[in-house]
Swiss-Prot record:
Gene3D superfamilies: 2,3-Dihydroxybiphenyl 1,2-Dioxygenase, domain 1. This is Uncharacterized protein PA2024. InterPro entries: Cadmium-induced_rsp, Glyas_Bleomycin-R_OHBP_Dase, Glyas_Fos-R_dOase_dom, VOC. GO terms for biological process: response to cadmium ion.
Length: 140
């Protein structure tokens, strides 16, 4: 078997705020909690993806201070441009919108970006050749 990416592990300054962010904006759910080294370790996953890919989040990290033109991010696919616009509106109301919706040439597509409570950027896109529903799109 070749290596398979199964998780990303992140230390975050405010565990509860990060859980709420990923539940609210990404549709992820806590699937596991346990004590760990004087704190708590939490696993989060998208419904149906629990055994494929998870975020492991733990308290204790420092906030990331990324520049607005730093494109380091986690990427999530959405079902339509309207879904990107709706999510961007909700993020703007919550004060976490970093990149307003914009169009880029293929394979980037239509996307917006949010800042999670730890300072990580999270992209929400439509029209990329990645994720559910993209099987008919060519890989560039």
């Amino acid at each position: 078997m070749s290596p398979t990416l199964t998780h990303l592990a992140l230390h975050v300054p405010d565990l509860d705020a990060c859980i709420a962010f990923y539940e609210t904006f990404c549709g992820m759910r806590v699937i596991h909690r346990r004590p760990g080294k004087g704190s708590q370790i939490v696993w989060m996953a998208e419904p149906g993806q629990e055994q494929r890919f998870i975020f492991v989040i733990m308290p204790g990290g420092q906030p990331r201070n990324l520049a607005s033109d730093d494109y380091s991010h986690f990427g999530f696919a959405l079902s339509s441009r309207a879904a990107v616009d709706d999510l961007a509106r909700r993020a703007e109301a919550a004060g976490c919108l970093v990149w307003a919706p914009r169009d880029e040439p293929y394979p980037v597509g239509y996307y917006c970006g949010l800042r999670d409570p730890a300072g990580n950027y999270v992209e929400f896109s439509y029209g990329q050749p990645l994720g559910p529903g993209s099987e008919a799109l060519p890989i560039p």
